[in-house]
Design a protein with these regions (language model features):
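Outer-membrane beta-barrel proteins
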Residues: 1-311
Length: 311
């Protein structure tokens, strides 16, 4: 990483002599053992991320990013190149994002999930949960601060454009909107979210609220969300995270009451840092009620033990 950083610094110093540009490179890797009853697997993946930014003469920061990823939780394990979909402009407490991968603020009340994607691999999952059909695409977002509050407005003109270079702004048939408000009331953090998705056959809406509070040496989070349209129902969740010595322990619980199903999910996660960007983790997820179809390779209870490294 040190040699890579020095190389990138040398190259960018030569190219951007007059501009106030910055290019940073980071990497990560994960290796784990994953189990779903009798289906036992190894999972190995990693990513390299590039963050690019520059500052105009007026002080506005313009940034973008890209990455190369091999997902440890993907059954296909295909290497992907991501990024260069959005450009971010930030100045004076206001941030504007333009691009083909702008997301609306859905999932605000979903606080019960505390495990990573590897522990969730091959889990049957809750059969139905709150959500909208699609939450990103070609569009823009504007976020600004008012004292201790942050307000965000989101518009997606073409939800079918992600991973493409072009978005169909005037002829798109899939659109989305949203708003998000974050503030503190006393010692309680409050986040409100609203998101919509609409196409020729769907008219989805989702609202959510999340509250956070420092309690008993940790952080307690409580959330609630409701959606109508394709996924009609309510979902509530609670999670608690605390540090014991250097270890971080998180427990989460979610309950979904949908039109045709009802299910619960319980998560437990423990991680311990070893220094130098290396940590070990153990995670477990269990679902009950109306779950996904059980097969020889899936289970209502799954777990993962492994190590994650950041470079």
């Amino acid at each position: 990483m040190k040699k890579l950083s020095l190389l990138v610094s040398a190259i960018t110093a030569g190219i951007f002599t007059t501009a106030q540009a910055d290019i940073s490179v980071s990497g990560s890797s994960t290796i784990a053992y994953q189990s779903a009853d009798s289906n036992n697997n190894s999972a190995h993946g990693g990513a390299v991320s590039f963050a690019l930014s520059t500052t105009t003469d007026s002080g506005m920061t313009v940034s973008s990013g890209a990455g190369i990823t091999l997902s440890a939780s993907s059954t296909g394990a295909a290497r992907t190149v991501s990024g260069f979909q959005n450009i971010t402009f930030a100045t004076g407490g206001t941030t504007v994002v333009l691009g083909n991968d702008v997301g609306v603020p859905d999932g605000v009340g979903d606080v019960g999930g505390v495990v990573g994607d590897i522990a969730a691999l091959n889990n049957n999952g809750m059969s139905s949960t709150v959500g909208i059909t699609d939450d990103e695409g070609t569009g823009m977002s504007l976020t600004t601060t008012f004292g201790s509050a942050t307000v965000g407005l989101y518009y997606v003109a073409d939800s079918a454009s992600t991973s493409k270079a072009l978005g169909d702004i005037d002829g798109a048939t899939e659109t989305g909107t949203g708003a998000k408000f974050t503030t503190t009331v006393g010692d309680v953090g409050v986040t409100l979210g609203y998101a919509t998705y609409e196409d020729s056959s769907a008219d989805d809406e989702e609202t959510g609220i999340a509250l956070t509070y420092a309690a008993m040496g940790g952080t307690l989070s409580v959330g609630y969300e409701n959606s109508t349209g394709t996924n009609d129902g309510n979902q509530a969740g609670v999670s608690y995270a605390m540090t014991l010595d250097a270890a971080t322990v998180s427990i989460g619980f979610s309950s979904a009451d949908m039109t045709a199903s009802s299910s619960t999910q319980t998560d437990v996660a423990v991680s311990y840092p070893l220094g130098g960007g290396v940590s070990v983790f153990a995670e477990m997820r269990s679902v009950s009620g109306d779950t996904g179809t059980d097969t020889s390779s899936t289970s209502n209870s799954t777990m993962a033990i492994g190590s994650s490294i950041t470079f």
